[in-house]
């Protein structure tokens, strides 16, 4: 007999009374491949045996035939999915990172992290931080992964992520800036359609609709981060809150991308404005695509606007 449903958090998942979690979207996977058909090869490597977590690496095929002196920009990518769905192995992210690596001629490391509800926030942040340290352990050329040892330019390290991954990217750069003794030098972060929120709208143009605001709050408070003391004003979610300070952000430049129809658009713009006003000495670039919705560049990657953003993202990495 099928288990009884305890709760549903549409469109993401369904939780049964026996504790089983059924993800309703974002579950498809595609294998890594050393086939150079698309000019990019990929492979999976475990970085956290204790949690059975891997990274998926993407490398331009031509680089596999070159010497160790062929150093490439390194993109550490953090997928989105409301802290609940998706992975580096989904077609959505595999195909996107393939295009980014092909266009930017960079090495990309796409990070798997534990997801809610089985492992609620802050597990995802802890895992990504662990992965970043694992990646930087290759900076002296003696790490466990040859691709990183041979091809990563640790003077050109970028973090990038969309939605929840954009949120995590910001917090990782903040942590890198704070943990100076670790010497994790990050050149820039790309914060794409970041999932930032709060109890109150950031301005008069932010989402005012109570049903929408309560729906996002429910996802955060009941499934993504049920242990948050302050609900949607948790500093991990409400980065634009009055108590936040970006002056210690550990990177030189930030690309903030927002979409006009996205519920997070005003939060993203407020984030960029706060960066520009604080004592952080880096540079901020804002890319706003009117008439588009959340992660449109992933959902419709061949559209003119998606290709336009891909070009901007690539310029950010190689510029």
Curated annotation (Swiss-Prot):
Tissue: Expressed in roots, leaves, stems, flowers and siliques.
Enzyme Commission number(s) from the entry: 3.1.1.1
UniProt KW keywords: Acetylation, Hydrolase, Serine esterase
Enzyme class: hydrolase
Residues that span the membrane, as ranges: none
Motif extent (Involved in the stabilization of the negatively charged intermediate by the formation of the oxyanion hole): 79-81
Name used for this protein in its record: Probable carboxylesterase 5
Species for this entry: Arabidopsis thaliana (Mouse-ear cress)
């Amino acid at each position: 007999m099928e288990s009884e449903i305890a709760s549903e958090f549409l469109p993401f998942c369904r939780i049964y009374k026996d504790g089983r979690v059924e993800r309703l979207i974002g579950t498809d996977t595609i294998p890594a491949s050393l086939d150079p058909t698309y000019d990019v090869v990929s492979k999976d490597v475990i970085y956290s045996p204790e949690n059975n977590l891997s990274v998926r690496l993407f490398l331009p095929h031509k680089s596999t035939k070159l010497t160790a002196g062929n150093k490439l920009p390194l993109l550490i990518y953090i997928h989105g999915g409301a802290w609940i769905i998706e992975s580096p192995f989904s077609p959505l992210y595999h195909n996107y990172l393939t295009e980014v690596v092909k266009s930017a001629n960079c090495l990309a490391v796409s990070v798997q992290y534990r997801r809610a509800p089985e492992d609620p926030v802050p597990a995802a942040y802890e895992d990504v931080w662990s992965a970043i340290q694992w990646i930087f352990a290759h900076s002296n050329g003696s790490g466990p992964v040859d691709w990183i040892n041979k091809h990563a330019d640790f003077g050109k390290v970028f973090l990038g992520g969309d939605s929840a991954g954009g949120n995590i990217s910001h917090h990782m750069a903040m942590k890198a800036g704070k943990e100076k003794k670790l010497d994790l030098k990050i050149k820039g972060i790309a914060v794409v359609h970041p999932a930032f929120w709060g109890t109150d709208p950031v301005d008069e143009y932010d989402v005012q609709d109570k049903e929408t605001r309560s729906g996002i709050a429910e996802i955060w408070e009941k499934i993504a981060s049920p242990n948050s003391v302050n609900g949607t004003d948790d500093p991990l979610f409400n980065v634009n809150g009055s108590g936040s300070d970006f002056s210690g952000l550990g990177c030189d430049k930030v690309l903030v991308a927002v979409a006009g129809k996205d519920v997070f658009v005003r939060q993203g713009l407020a984030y960029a404005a706060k960066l520009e006003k604080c004592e952080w000495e880096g540079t901020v670039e804002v890319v706003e695509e009117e008439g588009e919705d959340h992660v449109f560049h992933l959902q419709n990657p061949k559209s003119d606007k998606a290709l336009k953003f891909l070009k901007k993202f690539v310029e950010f990495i190689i510029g």
